[in-house]
Amino acid sequence: MATTHNLGFPRIGGQRELKFALEDYWGGRQTEQELAITAADLRLRHWQQQAGLDYVPVGDFSLYDQVLDMSVTLGNLPIRAASKEGSELDAYFRAARGRGANDSPCCATAAGEMTKWFDTNYHYIVPELTADTHFELNPERLLTQLSEARKQGLNAKPVIIGPVTYLWLGKTSDASNRLDLLERLLPVYSQLLEALADAGAEWVQLDEPALVTDLDANWRYAFNLAYHQLKANRPKLLLATYFGELRDNLQLACELPVAGLHIDAISAPAEVSRVADWLPSHKVLSLGVVNGRNIWKSDLNSTLGWLEPLNEKLGQRLWLAPSCSLLHAPVDLSREQELDSDIRNWLAFAVQKLDELQILARALNEGRSSVRAELADNQLAIDSRRNSHRVTNPEVRKAVASVTPELGNRHSPYPQRIARQRERLNLPAFPTTTIGSFPQTREIRQARLQFRKGELSEQAYIEQMRAEIVRCVEAQEKLGLDVLVHGEPERNDMVEYFGEQLDGYAFTRFGWVQSYGSRCVKPPILFGDIRRPQAMTVEWIRYAQSLTDKPVKGMLTGPVTILNWSFVRDDQPRKDSCLQLALAIREEVQDLEKAGVNIIQIDEAALREGLPLRQSDWATYLEWAINSFRIAANGVDDSTQIHTHMCYSEFNDIIEAIARMDADVITIETSRSDMELLDAFRSFEYPNDIGPGVYDIHSPNIPDKEHIINLMTLAAERIPAERLWINPDCGLKTRKWEEVTPALETMVAAARELRS
């Protein structure tokens, strides 16, 4: 009798209700009580959408981030966030974004460091640890949500981050060993599990995705120590792994003293039979059989083909779930009435994935005949996609076949190129620039919406966007920036904007997923071969350049980032789709150069998040990813300067690979980690120009001039000053003009002082 459960559900709401409630609260337009009501309503609705499952997750809902929630539960908020006046919620948001709803800009504090959640586009707030970190249980959030769910008659399964992964995700600021804190942490976990059991929890899910990464003997010992100590607690423990294969941690995971183990059967299909054989006969095996990270329908008949023998073997010990939390999937496909009907029929969002789960369970428990119609409909959809003429393009296939290694090479090495570029551009020392986007005001968003609805003519839309470009260029000239951008008012998203102009992409209206906090993205759907029918950005950049004598950067998103921030077809290797994207971007780069654009930025913000979780797999990924970037970037003259930008990543371990990209200038996010990236330059001499981000745009805080000068002075100890640029650490799209202007004034003032 297969049991169904879920590891987590999207928290933002089908219409992004959480996003808007948070922003209203931060903006003083909503009270803390009103925010709490919205959150409770969303939780109730999400539980109702999961009510057909045998176990429903509790604690997966968060106002900002589940890792930050765990820090709160463990009493591990940074002192700087918790020591000021205000509510617990104010302290929570200070840790997340540097400012509570009731804090003034002058009283803001440093936001917590934010980085990518494993190899996804979700960001978490890094737990801050020192040798003196003290943990203290604060279970109210979890207990409240558990009580709410039980009142609805639901079989609730609390979800928490396991103790070893929590420490693994953290970072120490004093060179101490994170694992030294484990013995101090485990009693708090024991108290939490006991409290959840007292509140009626039969099962508790402990997420330990660190088990799918490379672990040394100390971390493996930590798992044994932790779970042998926690096994005495009353609730049954379901240890959840996801995003990859267990590999050399498989035996460890199977032998830990827990009541059940969840593995990702989508990412690690070859391990299913091994785990089933290894797992002791008293333990539950939960299989992630529906892809929680993509939007394609599952092939249910194929899945049943390998599940049915396991069901015979395991019986009641078999649980079924999505591969990971559905946090990474849009909420509900049923609202996508404008989506092409053929493509819509190929898709499943979070709600539909749970339907698939229940069809599989019924087929196992009652026989395939009990879901004959559902399986037949599913097979029709699978066959439709497999046989569709819309998926392949012979012209694209021919272009890919003609690619040669020479396409990835510039004419000359960097020293010769940079000499020509400096002569052409004539920029001052420590040149200042921004990363690309400027604030997307209400007026910009409204114009884009009206244009999409047909309420605004194309000419009127172009005129309004041009007016915004004028505003942006004039503002940058007034600020004294050296290299300008057009501000990207016409772009809804740095990936979707390009996808909308490429053959092989489809788009949703409501396919939002959370990136961090209130920030949501709507990944386009890469369903077929990629072709660029016409130029995508040239006219906007040409217009911006006509307004100023200063250089204006052409702004493109790179092939690897477009790939990693899309929902990607799963019927061919990702590297094949990436190469198709690279050829399309290469055409755009060449058109920009022909239009007289002297600096072209190709953002690869998501390069690192595509890295496999196991270091032994990195070389293969980096080879095709960097090759794709080089093919996109290197079809230009030596005097054309190629920039790239990367964000929210740690690069020290791939700095040599980044150097192989051979961009003339790279700008990177370093402000939240206090230039930690520069540690890489102790042992590696980065050969090209670099702009280490000097202030954090994800926080509303205004940077301090002396802090910027100190950061750049530190950078100049590692990199020759003549190769340093000064810039924010990311685009300014999500900020307000009243935040952007003083921040950039400070940045330019710092640059001028450094020059003097």
From Swiss-Prot:
L-methionine binds at residues 435-437, 488, 603. Transmembrane segments: none annotated. This is 5-methyltetrahydropteroyltriglutamate--homocysteine methyltransferase. Disulfide bonds: none annotated. L-homocysteine binds at residues 435-437, 488, 603. One of its GO terms (molecular function) is 5-methyltetrahydropteroyltriglutamate-homocysteine S-methyltransferase activity. Belongs to the vitamin-B12 independent methionine synthase family. Pathway: Amino-acid biosynthesis; L-methionine biosynthesis via de novo pathway; L-methionine from L-homocysteine (MetE route): step 1/1. Zn(2+) binds at residues 645, 647, 669, 730. It is an enzyme of class 2 (transferase). It comes from the Bacteria. GO terms for biological process: methionine biosynthetic process; methylation. It catalyses: 5-methyltetrahydropteroyltri-L-glutamate + L-homocysteine = tetrahydropteroyltri-L-glutamate + L-methionine. Keywords: Amino-acid biosynthesis, Metal-binding, Methionine biosynthesis, Methyltransferase, Repeat, Transferase, Zinc. Its cofactor is Zn(2+). Catalyzes the transfer of a methyl group from 5-methyltetrahydrofolate to homocysteine resulting in methionine formation. 5-methyltetrahydropteroyltri-L-glutamate binds at residues 16-19, 116, 519-520, 565, 609. The lineage of its organism: Bacteria, Pseudomonadati, Pseudomonadota, Gammaproteobacteria, Pseudomonadales.
